[in-house]
Regions:
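Conserved C-terminal RecA-like helicase domain
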Residues: 1-2, 112-208, 223, 232-244
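SF2 helicase catalytic motif II
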Residues: 2-39
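A short beta-strand element within the Helicase C-terminal
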Residues: 7-10, 208-232, 244, 259-264
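Structural recognition of the conserved hydrophobic beta-strand(s) that form the central parallel beta-sheet
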Residues: 11-12, 43-50, 208-211
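Conserved segment of the helicase C-terminal RecA-like domain
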Residues: 42-43, 221, 232-281
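Conserved interdomain linker/interface between the two RecA-like ATPase lobes of SF2 helicase motors
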Residues: 42-143, 183
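C-terminal helicase module of SF1/SF2 nucleic-acid helicases/translocases
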Residues: 257-350
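C-terminal accessory/interaction regions of large nucleic acid-associated machines
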Residues: 306-340, 359-605
Length: 605
């Protein structure tokens, strides 16, 4: 936060994310809005959300009295909704929340690939498949299907495919799929590749887009047809608001009058009767939501109380959500000057949960970290922050501070220190938790990432590591095989795992700990706390020119590309921390149209 900045307007798009149950991201979003409002009490607050019958819930959440609410039930295009049960050869369409059978079509389509290929042939199609593993297997299966039909490759996509091979790896399966007008899309893809896929889907170079729920995360990508092959989002069933948000991608304004939504059951467990009733036959205009921290289950309230009292999450499902919520309650009880006006405190007080507030206040008696640091780091357990704060005082600044040009050995040493003082193995929870034994691996990735290595270089090094150490690759069905660099499935799995580690474990989890560590160093040792590695991670470089280019709006990959290919055009004034770009027209002219960097450079130079 910066006290010199006054915010007059706050716009919250996709506001339904504040209501996602057992999702810590909803709590982080709430906290960011609430803190911004506390610093800017006169700011005007705007929410937008699809398919919601009680939009006033967002104003109530933040105690906004006399707020105006507008609700529309009109869609941009008409939509036709179908349910196709291939296991029982039943085809139906939805009319007034009822399934109406369609006769004489069950012999036309024998597989889901028949449906995807033949229905609305020649029109754009989004195929929702659930998780990443399903997305990849469905893409592979469809690619085999169209090859058997002797479908031709699309020459206009050859350049796109070569860019994917250059940016990621020659064996990455996405490249071959794109040559046939097919692509997959999920959160672990590099943003540059996602942008490339979305752009080429919009202009018609990509016809079939297999995806996860990433398309629910604010990506505006409509299509003529949307195929929904499962009622689940990850391991959980869709909430109606998510289902209709995804279905709303069907129909392209100003291109056609209607869009089609096909919910297809071709495997057991993808669509059961309950999902059909709660989703397909639900009224999208009558969806009511409640904020994620409104706990209506007495068991969950008791579990929250247990975590606050004991600090233990043992035996609790979705414990990371309740742990984060418990810390938010504890922090808010510290904010004594604001406590009477804080929505979180008011909610528990008004619902008769004063015991929770009592235990929360009692649990922070010995916490002496400044409130502003606790508020900025709710994703790190308070007890973990407290332990680190106390441990740091036992070291000298020379033992703690981080260097500006770290070696792999220094990174390993400092990561081990951070793991120990934060007790990360104790407080890090979940399937994707950090692990002390993986520090050598984290250090290798961190070293390359912070020194500006490209993704393809990092991937190539990972492949060499797997080969030289005769490592196994873990596949989607929980089996493992000796890694084979000539197996495109192995390459794709390794690429996706590496990108996930860069973005999640390095770029989010470790960055959060390192950022907090640097905040504590600045607090305890006021002079020269050393380099801030969290900035190196955020920018993916320790080069100030690459930083400055990203400040201008360029992505990491594009900033590194410009630094590498046009160094004479980039003049950095170190004294004033200012970057000057010379001969912009020449740079634009030398970057080939439709290249990975072309759109960015044309827009920003």
């Amino acid at each position: 936060t910066c006290p010199d900045i006054i915010i007059d307007y706050i716009f919250v798009d996709e506001a339904q994310k504040l209501t996602i149950k057992n999702d810590t991201r909803s709590l982080v979003t709430y906290s960011a809005i609430e803190q911004t409002l506390n610093l800017n009490p006169n700011a005007k607050l705007f929410f937008s959300s699809p398919n919601l019958s009680n939009p006033e819930v967002f104003n109530d959440l933040f105690n906004r009295d006399h707020a105006k609410v507008y609700r529309s039930i009109e869609g941009a295009t008409a939509q036709n909704l179908y349910f196709i049960d291939l296991l029982n050869n039943k085809f139906s369409y939805v009319d007034k929340n009822k399934l109406i059978d369609i006769d004489n079509v069950n012999q036309t389509y024998t597989s889901v690939n028949d449906l995807i290929f033949q229905i609305n042939k020649g029109k754009s199609k989004i195929i929702y498949t659930g998780g990443i593993d399903n997305t990849l297997s469905r893409t592979r299966d469809f690619l085999r299907y169209i090859k058997k039909l002797q479908s031709n490759k699309k020459p206009q996509n050859f350049d796109l495919a070569s860019q994917v091979r250059e940016f990621v790896h020659t064996g990455y399966e996405l490249a071959e799929a794109i040559e046939y007008g097919v692509a997959f899309h999920f959160g672990n893809l590099p943003q540059a590749i996602r942008d490339l896929i979305e752009y080429n889907f919009k202009i018609g170079n990509i016809d079939y887009l297999f995806c996860t729920s990433t398309l629910l995360e604010g990506v505006n990508l409509p299509a003529r047809s949307v195929f929904i092959l499962t009622s689940k989002k990850g391991t959980r069933y869709f909430e109606p608001v998510d289902f209709w948000n995804l279905a709303g991608r069907a129909g392209r304004l100003a291109i056609e009058l209607a869009g089609d939504i096909f919910c297809v059951k071709d495997e057991s467990g993808t669509w059961n009767d309950k999902a059909v009733k709660n989703l397909i036959l639900s009224n999208k205009n009558e969806i009511e939501l409640t904020p994620s921290f409104y706990l209506n289950d007495s068991k969950r309230i008791k579990e929250l109380e247990q975590i606050i009292k004991t600090g233990s999450t043992e035996g609790i499902q979705n414990s990371e959500f309740l742990r984060t919520l418990s810390d938010m309650v504890r922090i808010d009880t510290l904010r004594t000057d604001k406590a009477n006006n804080l929505p979180l405190i008011n909610y528990f007080r008004n619902n008769g949960n004063n015991d929770i507030l009592h235990y929360a206040l009692k649990s922070i008696d010995n916490i002496n970290i400044p409130t502003h640091i606790l508020l900025a780091n709710s994703h790190i357990a308070i007890n973990s922050q407290h332990n680190a704060f106390n441990c740091i005082r036992n070291y000298s600044i020379d033992e703690l501070k981080l260097s500006w040009n770290p070696t792999n050995e220094e990174i390993k040493e400092k990561l081990a220190l951070i793991f120990n003082i934060y007790q990360i193995d104790k407080y890090s929870k979940g399937l994707n938790r950090l692990n002390f034994n993986s520090i050598p691996y984290y250090a290798v990735i961190l070293t390359k990432w912070m020194h500006g290595n490209t993704l393809s270089e990092i991937i190539s090094d990972a492949i060499v590591y797997y080969i030289s150490n005769r490592k196994n690759i873990y596949l989607s069905d929980k089996t493992q095989e000796p890694f084979d660099q000539n197996n495109s499935i192995h390459i794709t799995k390794l690429v996706n795992d590496t990108i996930k580690d860069i973005e999640l474990k390095i770029g989010y989890q470790l960055q959060n700990y390192i950022s907090h560590y640097c905040q504590l160093l600045s607090l305890v040792f006021e002079n020269n706390p050393g380099a801030n590695w969290s900035q190196f991670i955020e920018f993916g470089s320790n080069d100030p020119i690459v930083w400055q280019l990203q400040f201008m709006g360029f992505s990491r990959h594009c900033a590194i590309f410009l630094k590498k290919n046009f160094p004479k055009h980039l003049k950095y004034d170190q004294e004033n921390n200012q970057l000057y770009i010379l001969n912009r027209a020449e740079i634009k002219s030398k970057v080939k149209q439709n290249k990975l960097y072309w759109l960015e450079i044309q827009a920003l130079l």
